[in-house]
């Protein structure tokens, strides 16, 4: 019953402010989105929790009363992987059972009820590991659903347990990608499958085999890896259509971001066709970039989606388009000049949408946005701080929001365009003992003059912060580079965990950051070590001059991905001498090694050309330049994992080699089973012990605070053959 431990915390929680440790954060419950029932009085959500004592993870599905905030357990059966409301009433459910009694490697669809979940029944047997369940109940009472799985070219779903095993482990490629994110490509690919559950007198039953809607389109794939999920496709409310996103199959996938939104009959009676392809009548002129998030209107007459204009720039501005099914005219942009890049949408009604977008280091909701809004229409925000992760429109047209913030891992509330935030229903810092005492007072922000414009930065305070005292600086640099440090919870780079070691964390959003207008985002192109570095220098100078409670003499700095590149760049720069220690996680080091990445469009955009045609651009910001290496002197921890194919592990090894040969105190931390991110809890705990232990040793935190994380907390032996 470990999964239920946190449920009792709903009743009462200590008001004592506690420092949050890495172990507390990693073992705290991780909750999913709150999904409301048709009446909007109860919501479903998933939860999982890892125990460092038992080394096991428990999972559950729960019900949240949207009026009282009370939480009750629905099921703690680990085989229940996904649940959706069946529709037609407020209690019926459809879920995926992650096992199959008849087919090894398959799953099952079950129908049940919140009244007595254990008395459900099997409605369909599926012959592979399907996931991403979406379902609508049609007027006939039948259920039209879509799921996704790996597929063979012939349309058959791939089942790993039943697949042919070759005697050789060889891989052979005639095209790129060879590998992507953390996976070597094979001849199988992701595909969306459609199916029907027929309504019988007493039960639903499968109407026949699933239809593969993607395989008939050569080289199409949906959801698109590595981050594609069920938001890459949608089922129309009338059950007649499925829309899905795929990278454009007619251009080299490693060189272009171009994507199409395809429309297919749910019954698979004809091949899917793109609504925004090069030969589609509705395609807007000059719009050739990534497209995503297709979502049908309630009346099934319109399909909203986002698309970028640039065909090889993954961080171009997204623009909302609304396609009318059956239309042969150009699909109009909606609020086309809005200087934000929305990435989610929900229909408020048949004529208006709610949009989610990054905005000034938050993720906020905007609307209502009319589908016929002119280019100069400016959507209005109606949520506050934090980061919205999902949302659903309720019957009364209020919006049920699930989000996070730097101070809470789960925050459920209602909001509306007219009233703004209405009511907080549940928040992790009020439920979980390990997060007790965290609140919005733990953070603040400031703006300062950067290299060429105003730059925003977060401040995160430690437990029992006292402005009359001094705390070492923890300077955090985000990755991307076209990304941001938002007001959101993270289990990888949790600023509050860092602060509670005894630091004041400062996290700037320099040139290249998203959510502050496209000009700031675009300005990092061919400028990696230029304006962003100067922005960071000026952030440090601002802190040194204006925040008397920050001890910059004993400050430390850390960054990941592009932030890791910047740590390596700082190591060879004057700013590097301002820090007692540095941590580089998965950062680039050798300029010429960038060609070993997988998404070539990224480097070719950010360095204004190909590796052979613009080599000087690649080398302009080279942390491994000899004159920079000669400046290396600040102790540095290098972290790099074997399954990182975005920035291969050789980059971390190269940096560590140079640091060691230069006699700079240094350590290399490697995980053979992690990618660009460290996700497994046991590995993440070691990551925190080593990262914080390294910084604490050189900042003085370890000596001043006996409870601080230490390098010695890790039981993994250190390999050291130095004479």
UniProtKB/Swiss-Prot annotation:
Cited Pfam families: Peptidase_S9
Sugar attachment sites: 79, 97, 154, 255, 381, 451, 608
Predominant subcellular localization, coarse grouping: secreted
Enzyme class: hydrolase
Compartments it resides in: Secreted
Cellular component terms per the entry's GO annotation: extracellular region
Heme listed as a keyword: no
Family designation: Belongs to the peptidase S9C family.
Official protein name in the record: Probable dipeptidyl-peptidase 5
UniProt organism field: Aspergillus terreus (strain NIH 2624 / FGSC A1156)
């Amino acid at each position: 019953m470990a999964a239920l431990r946190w449920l009792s915390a709903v009743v009462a929680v200590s008001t004592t402010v506690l420092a949050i440790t890495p172990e507390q954060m990693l073992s705290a419950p991780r909750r999913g989105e709150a999904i409301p029932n048709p009446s909007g009085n109860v919501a479903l959500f998933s939860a999982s929790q890892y125990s460092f004592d038992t080394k096991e993870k428990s999972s559950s599905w729960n019900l949240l009363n949207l009026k009282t905030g009370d939480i009750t357990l629905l099921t703690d059966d680990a085989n229940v992987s996904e649940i959706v409301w069946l529709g037609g009433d407020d209690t019926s459910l459809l879920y995926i059972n992650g096992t199959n009694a008849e087919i090894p490697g398959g799953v099952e669809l079950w129908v049940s009820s919140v009244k007595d979940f254990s008395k459900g029944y099997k409605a369909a047997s599926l012959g592979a590991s399907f996931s991403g369940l979406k379902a609508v109940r049609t007027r006939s009472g039948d259920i039209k659903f879509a799921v996704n799985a790996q597929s063979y070219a012939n349309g058959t779903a791939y089942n790993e347990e039943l697949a042919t095993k070759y005697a050789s482990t060889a891989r052979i490629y005639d095209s790129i990608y060879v590998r992507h994110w953390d996976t070597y490509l094979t001849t199988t690919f992701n595909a969306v499958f459609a199916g029907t559950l027929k309504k019988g007198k007493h039960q639903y039953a499968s109407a026949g085999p699933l239809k593969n809607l993607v395989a008939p389109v050569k080289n199409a794939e949906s959801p698109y890896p590595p981050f594609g999920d069920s938001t890459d496709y949608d089922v129309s409310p009338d059950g007649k259509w499925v829309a899905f996103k795929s990278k454009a199959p007619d251009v080299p996938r490693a060189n272009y971001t171009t994507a199409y939104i395809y429309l297919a009959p749910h019954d698979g009676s004809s091949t899917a066709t793109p609504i925004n392809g090069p030969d589609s009548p509705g395609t807007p002129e000059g719009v050739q970039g990534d497209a995503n998030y297709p979502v049908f209107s309630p009346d099934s007459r319109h399909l909203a989606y986002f698309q970028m204009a640039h065909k090889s720039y993954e961080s171009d501005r997204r623009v909302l388009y609304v396609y009318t099914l059956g239309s042969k005219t150009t699909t109009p942009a909606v609020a086309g000049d809005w200087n934000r890049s929305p990435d989610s949408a929900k229909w408020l009604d048949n004529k208006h949408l709610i949009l989610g977008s990054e905005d000034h280091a938050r993720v906020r909701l905007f609307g209502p946005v009319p589908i016929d809004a002119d280019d100069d229409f400016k959507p209005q925000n109606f949520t506050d701080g934090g980061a919205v992760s999902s949302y659903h429109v309720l019957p009364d047209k209020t919006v049920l929001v699930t989000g996070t913030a730097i101070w809470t891992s789960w925050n459920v509330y209602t909001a509306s365009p007219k009233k703004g935030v209405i009511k907080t229903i549940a928040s992790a810092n009020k439920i979980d003992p390990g997060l007790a005492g965290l609140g919005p007072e733990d953070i603040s922000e400031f703006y300062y003059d950067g290299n060429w414009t105003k730059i925003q930065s977060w401040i995160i305070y430690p437990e029992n912060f006292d402005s009359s005292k001094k705390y070492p600086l923890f300077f955090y640099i985000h990755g991307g580079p076209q990304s941001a440090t938002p007001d959101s919870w993270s289990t990888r780079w949790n600023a509050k965990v860092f602060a509670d070691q005894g630091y004041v964390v400062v996290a700037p959003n320099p040139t290249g950051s998203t959510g502050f207008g496209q000009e700031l985002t675009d300005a990092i192109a061919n400028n990696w070590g230029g304006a962003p570095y100067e922005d960071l220098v000026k952030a440090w100078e601002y802190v040194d001059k204006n925040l008397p409670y920050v001890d910059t003499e004993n400050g430390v700095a850390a960054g990941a991905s592009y932030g890791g590149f910047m740590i390596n760049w700082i190591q060879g720069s004057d700013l590097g001498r301002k820090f007692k220690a540095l941590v580089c996680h998965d950062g680039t080091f050798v300029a010429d090694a960038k060609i070993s990445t997988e998404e070539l469009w990224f480097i070719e955009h950010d360095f204004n050309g190909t590796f052979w045609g613009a080599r000087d651009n690649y080398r302009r910001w080279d942390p491994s330049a000899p004159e920079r290496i000669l400046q290396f002197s600040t102790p540095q921890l290098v972290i790099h994992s074997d399954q990182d194919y975005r920035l291969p592990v050789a980059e971390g090894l190269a940096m560590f080699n140079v640091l060691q040969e230069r006699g700079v105190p240094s350590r290399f931390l490697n995980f053979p089973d992690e990618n660009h991110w460290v996700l497994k809890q046991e590995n993440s705990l070691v990551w925190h012990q080593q990262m914080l232990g390294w910084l604490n040793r050189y900042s003085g935190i370890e000596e001043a605070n006996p409870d601080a994380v230490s390098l010695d907390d890790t039981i993994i032996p250190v390999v050291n053959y130095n004479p």
